[in-house]
């Protein structure tokens, strides 16, 4: 039998799209129990058989948190730290990994592409939070299932799906936020007829300038109040607009066969880089303009779901997807030209996923193909960000996961994935940089694996031990980028190989009635990591670039590091009306190669919440908190933006917040949120912009 499976893995031809789960969207108020889901207990749409810790955020929690963006969902969960460079941003940090070391996925399609960078990313805002059914946060290396980039974890966004048996259903949400005069209008409708199901949705957002908090309990009077870009507490040039659209169609051609279409479109207006506009040079603002152009994302998925049992599989899901993205960087120093650099990215992908069950055994296997094409252009006379002759990156992978019981109380899981990656970059103009090559070509491969044991010890006790590896293959951003930041010029390096993480973790769970406690301790080794180091080209260690003479740096595989930490969560069910939830996370990381602290490590953070719910009413009071990050605890590589903190580092902070909602009828819900009630001034770790001050949010949701 093993030979048949191996042959199938080698020769299967993908032909469709990954199925998505359907959960009805209804107006309701109740005590929403926070879920910690272990992979083997999740719905099959996720296809994860390894015992990674997974936290799910449901649609009702998303609505009650009133997030500004999908990155804001993660921060308000209390389980993930989020970095902000500008108002339209949000870069998740999971266990000390960020940006291209954390994988973003929507409806089974990878969002990470060939130009995801290593610093901070804002791409997660391209998914409307109101279009989501739920979000799964997968903690720890997850490369067996997801492939490259899943070093620290995975954030999987699941959008709404059309329901069967509904002639017509529509939802309308209106929301206002005082801290930025934000207006949010969302509408969707779905219907079904016979074998067909349809869903369409649109979200319009208009955000004004963001106000910071007034109360400076940290004692730093002028922190974040650069006079030329802050008026009182209003952070100027932080306004932006965004529009998101979704359309899904499902045809149940047979009882066991379905076809699907998934179309998503998102675009913003210009996003000013507040952390660049507040920079000074020789006593004057360094930039007159620094903004991202409209961030545009198109996703089209076509798919097949086949659930008729045969010798090879019980269920088969296939995803064919196409993504088209555009992003640009536009900067202008005072009395200088406006320099525009634009990237167009095209991603073609196909994932075939199979599940076979027998007795109490489950086998999941599949094939994944990803192909990225990157076109980079710039203002005439200036260099492009990436190879000006174009770049492409192709990845093909095969994977398998297996789960079986060893006894009545012990379950075993194991998995492996082999990936082959090819990257090409072509340079037409190399005179200014003096590159010793006209093209770059990399061929890398990686083998990753995972093992897990889950032991149900009895009397509500349960333990899970997991060992897993992850990898990230160098992408176009790592290999071909020409980039200036903090007075350093990054240039291409043709000698890069994948970076790997090795992780072991232990999770202990205790259930007492409807209450539970979960705690995870993890230790991770990061090997062959890609970091910037001083570099030379043709014997030169500096070059003239964009009006400055800058020292040269390049990405190299020169870092070995370790990280360890813990996450804990407690849910306390007091009675039918009252409950309390608490989360806390801590990570420590050290770069052993440089004998220095590792970057992207937030200080201890967490959330405590108490909820009351009765009939049509719900009330929640919660506190977010964050410990100090002292200046001496920052990484020396500059990735954590110490220049945006105080001279002593980033002060500790906590905010008090309120959420209350009421069902006015079966079809109408009203909600009031008051965030940062005490109007505290603070910045989240590594952020270039001050966090929102007191914010009153009014929401009205109608179903018809």
Give the residues covered by each predicted segment.
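Flexible loop and strand-edge segments within Gram-negative outer membrane beta-barrel domains
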Residues: 23, 236-238, 242, 255-315, ...
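N-terminal periplasmic accessory domains that precede
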Residues: 35, 70-73, 90-93, 104-105, ...
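Outer membrane beta-barrel strand-and-loop segments of large Gram-negative receptors
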Residues: 341-354, 395-399, 491-497, 503, ...
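Transmembrane beta-barrel wall of Gram-negative outer-membrane proteins
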Residues: 180-207, 218-272, 296, 406, ...
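Short acidic/polar hinge/loop motifs at secondary-structure boundaries
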Residues: 111-139
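Short, acidic, small-residue-rich periplasmic hinge/interaction motif at the N-terminus
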Residues: 21-63, 99
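Surface-exposed extracellular loop regions of Gram-negative outer-membrane beta-barrel proteins
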Residues: 269, 276, 280, 324-326, ...
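Gram-negative outer-membrane beta-barrel transporters
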Residues: 407-408, 412, 421, 522-525, ...
